[in-house]
């Protein structure tokens, strides 16, 4: 028999379902995604570690790869997954995972709350996977995401020491990141393979997206980049949530770009300039040609204008 608490929570989830995933402040919001055209591509990057990515030029919010990247650690101890993609491509993801290993999917950890990384959670929970994530992520889902209660994390953790799992000859570290891309970010480090999945606080396409509505912050994003450079070695393979793999040295110009824009915006705020005036000044001009997608129209989710507006608002609020 279900407990009163379980029934109550289920009722709350049903009520907020009308808000749906679309209420989350995410890239590509309001744009139609042709889910039927998304193919799942598999890349083996270590003896038992694989990356699954959606096909390029399909998802308007992520032309560099539809949906969020998935990590798959396979072996005799079962399967450990990182992120779950869109709900609508769940069967395709399952098929790709089964081609790697037919064993049980035991654990799934979310890097952050956005539905291109979490909407498929329920698909894998119903296959027996235990979902792990930051406590802030679970709280955010209960507030806004709605949908199937099975998609909620059942094991949560906060800031502090990394949570470690040992399976398939690998040590997996779940490293909590202070409010960066969102308020509940986690990096996943595969120690023996020398691989770190960094989620979306680093991006290859367009300017940084700091989702303030879901707890992200400019200061936290910079701290996350610093932490990544600290724990990554010279040969560590860094895997963003979308796009190409990078190394530690690739973070330096990305971080410098953020600091450069931040300094310029701060200077203009000190001069009494309004947000409109700051946007008109095109403070990202020195970087636009170097940032893939940096010259896209202002309405695009990866645009310079959205980034500059966020920087302005964060600095005005003293964050």
Show where each model-derived region lies.
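Bacterial N-terminal signal peptides that target proteins for export
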Residues: 1-13, 22
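Accessory terminal helices/loops
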Residues: 16-19, 23-32, 230, 244-319
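Short N-terminal segments immediately surrounding and downstream of signal-peptide cleavage
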Residues: 26-47
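Conserved beta-strand hairpin/beta-sheet module of binuclear metal-dependent hydrolase folds
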Residues: 44-97, 186-190, 194-198
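Divalent metal-coordination and catalytic microenvironments
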Residues: 48, 73, 83, 97, ...
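Acidic/histidine-rich helix-loop elements
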Residues: 52-68, 141-147, 205-215
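Metallo-beta-lactamase
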Residues: 78-80, 86-88, 164, 171, ...
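Active-site HxH/HxHxD metal-binding segment of metal-dependent hydrolases
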Residues: 95-166, 183
């Amino acid at each position: 028999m279900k407990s009163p608490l379980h029934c109550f929570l289920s009722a709350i989830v049903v009520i907020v379902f009308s808000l749906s995933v679309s209420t989350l402040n995410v890239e590509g919001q309001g744009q139609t995604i042709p889910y039927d055209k998304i193919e799942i591509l598999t890349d083996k990057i270590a003896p038992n570690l694989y990356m699954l990515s959606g096909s390029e030029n399909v998802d308007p919010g992520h032309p560099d790869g539809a949906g969020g990247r998935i990590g798959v650690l396979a072996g005799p101890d079962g399967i450990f997954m990182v992120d779950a993609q869109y709900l609508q491509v769940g069967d395709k993801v399952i098929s790709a995972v089964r081609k790697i290993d037919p064993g049980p999917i035991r654990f799934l950890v979310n890097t952050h709350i956005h539905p291109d990384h979490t909407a498929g959670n329920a698909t894998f929970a119903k296959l027996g996977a235990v979902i792990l994530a930051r406590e802030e992520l679970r709280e955010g889902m209960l507030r806004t995401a709605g949908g199937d209660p099975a998609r909620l994390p059942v094991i949560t953790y906060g800031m502090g020491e990394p949570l470690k799992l040992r399976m398939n000859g690998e040590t997996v570290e779940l490293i909590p990141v202070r409010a960066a891309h969102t308020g509940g970010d986690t990096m996943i480090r595969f120690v023996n393979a020398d691989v770190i999945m960094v989620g979306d606080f680093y991006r290859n396409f367009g300017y940084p997206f700091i989702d303030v509505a879901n707890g992200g912050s400019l200061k936290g994003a910079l701290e996350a980049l610093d932490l990544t450079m600290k724990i990554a070695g010279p040969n560590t393979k860094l895997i963003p949530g979308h796009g190409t793999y990078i190394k530690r040295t690739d973070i330096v110009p990305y971080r410098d770009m953020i600091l450069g824009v931040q300094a310029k915006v701060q200077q203009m705020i000190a001069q009494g300039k309004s947000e409109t005036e700051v946007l008109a000044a095109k403070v990202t001009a020195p970087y636009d040609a170097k940032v893939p997608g940096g010259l896209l129209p202002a309405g695009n989710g990866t645009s310079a204008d959205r980034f500059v507006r966020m920087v302005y608002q964060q600095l005005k609020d003293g964050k």
